[in-house]
Curated annotation (Swiss-Prot):
Tissues/organs with expression: Predominantly expressed in roots.
Gene Ontology annotations for the cellular component aspect, listed alphabetically: cytosol; mitochondrion
Main location: mitochondrion
GO biological process: iron-sulfur cluster assembly
GO function term, MF aspect, one: iron ion binding
UniProt keyword list: Mitochondrion, Transit peptide
Entry's localization field: Mitochondrion
Record-given protein name: NifU-like protein 4, mitochondrial
Biological role: Molecular scaffold for [Fe-S] cluster assembly of mitochondrial iron-sulfur proteins.
Keyword Membrane carried by entry: no
Species of origin: Arabidopsis thaliana (Mouse-ear cress)
Entry keyword annotation includes Mitochondrion: yes
InterPro entries linked to this entry: FSCA_dom_sf, Nfu/NifU_N, Nfu/NifU_N_sf, NIF_FeS_clus_asmbl_NifU_C
Amino acid sequence: MKGIARLVTSLSRIGGRKVVSGTSTVTSSSSSSLLLSRRSLFISATNLLNSRTKDSALPSLNSSLLAQKWNFLGGQRRTMFIQTQSTPNPSSLMFYPGKPVMEVGSADFPNVRSALGSPLAKSIYSIDGVVRVFFGSDFVTVTKSDDVSWDILKPEIFAAVMDFYSSGQPLFLDSQAAAAKDTAISEDDSETVAMIKELLETRIRPAVQDDGGDIEYCGFDPESGIVKLRMQGACSGCPSSSVTLKSGIENMLMHYVSEVKGVEQEFDGEDEEGTLSGEMRVE
């Protein structure tokens, strides 16, 4: 009904306009056609109302359509509205299922072996062309190889995500496995390390996660002043990751923590075998 009301309103506005350089014949014709349109609209609406009053078939049809839609969505749960978002890395894409993914922290799966502990990550890895999977709070970042098009991968990833959420399976087979609290401040941390972790958690990590990735704190060498970090998700392998690391993260850490002299990136090649449960981090 709102659409019809807008249509009638727009027609009224058009009919009420005066044409300065027109003739009376044109104005009369426009008014006549407008009245005819209104009359036809009124007759059509009246006939529709009468048919609803005399025959209950139309309401029954509407109810059955709503029931089928409700059963389709609520019973089988086979329909999801999944959104995608590009990242600075052209090989990575963020998928938003409209449902929470990680309740706490994030999880990175740099290889197939690391994805064996997660049914969703394992399912996505079974798609040809997928080389990395990352879980955020409400998104899944998928990284592909250069020789595969997103036009081919996206429908398969959509299906994998939809099948997972309709299956009722847990995100992880073992929720306690590999829960590395990399930025959690412990009693053994020095004041410098505590400041580094706080900056990573409150200032740097949120910005990196907006681009579909994350960072992992790997350590700090007090003698050299070097902070070691590992880029994850879309940030891993991104052409601009080195610029982000140096111009963004390094400058911020050096500005707020005088003991920091530089930042170095750790690469996944050093841990190629991975772990059965993935690199899951609890924040």
